[in-house]
Amino acid sequence: LKVSIVVATRNCEKYIKDLMDSLAKIVEDYIEVIVVDSSEDSTPAIVSEYGFAKLIRLEKLGLNVARNVGVREAKGDIIVFTDCDCVVPKEWIENILKVFKEEEAHVVGGSAVNFYEGLSLITDYANEGIWSVMPIYRERIVFDRDSFRKVRLPPGNNLAFKKEIFDKGYFFDEEYRWGSDEVDLLWRLCRDGFKIVADPSVYVYHKHRTSLLELLKQEFRYGMGHYTFFKKNRDSPLAWPAAIGSYVFALFLAALFTSYFLSPLAFLIIGLFMATITVEVYLTLFFYYFKRRKLRLKKCFLYPILDITCHALYLFGFLYSNIRDIIGRISCRTK
């Protein structure tokens, strides 16, 4: 089997050298590397130093446009995706091909392990949070319609597809700008009967967000992306939990805001109810991290705060995109 590794890049000069160095250690005759770049910095110059890489320059049209350009250029039977802020281990491709063979899978993915392990609480949280930004798989998982919403899906920085999938017209949806793009593609494949497998032997090292602000912005954007997924895939079991959560959240906020002007007593009651729910959620998460996960006490105290804050911003991102979509449709009708 021939393998094509596709990397879509934009302004990655800070990270790209580490990725290219790791790819240089795994390149063989049957492996090609395609970098589709839309950068305004020195990223393309750095990539050009690596003779094994095919560099394609593209105007800034979005991540998924770049991915699809890479797919159309790929010659491999297997097309593998990773990102510029990753580092791949030497056995990465070998393990991917092994899972394809053992499971007769159409898609293989895996973990995104913290490159900065132990650097800070923020970087550790991405793997250790209750619904981790970047998943770690402890066992092999085969996804179906039922498990699609129960287990974290493999991330787009560590996904491999049989070329035949793209030959049949399944591509990344280029409307997505803020996340959930790989979820959309995986859902369409799962719905149509293709076999998707995640395996712990298939992993990359990912440079997780290192600051709280970066993490919170990421969660807000993921919420925006999920609204696009919800709008396009209401038949998916993954579409509705965040949507329902967002609308209930909005209802409580609207009730709190309205009661502030209309009834001080109602404002107090609603505020106390929301505060009580928040405290109960915090304590539940604290004991989960302390008893089940056996994390250090500092993490047990702080991770629930991050969980609540990140999920709130995710819901805000969903609502923000929803409101923008409604305003856009109203504007179109009035023109």
Residue ranges and their predicted role:
Residues L58-A74, G156:
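Glycine-rich, basic loop-to-helix element that forms the pyrophosphate-binding segment
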Residues D21-Y30:
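Short, acidic, metal-binding catalytic loop of nucleotide-sugar glycosyltransferases
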Residues E91-D124:
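Conserved donor NDP-sugar-binding/catalytic core segment of glycosyltransferases
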Residues R140-F161, R177-W178, V204, R234-P237:
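A recurrent flexible, glycine/aromatic-enriched loop bordering the glycosyltransferase active site
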Residues G110-S111, E128-V151:
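Short, flexible, basic/aromatic active-site loop/helix in glycosyltransferases
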Residues I79:
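Short aromatic/hydrophobic "clamp" motif used to bind/position activated sugar donors
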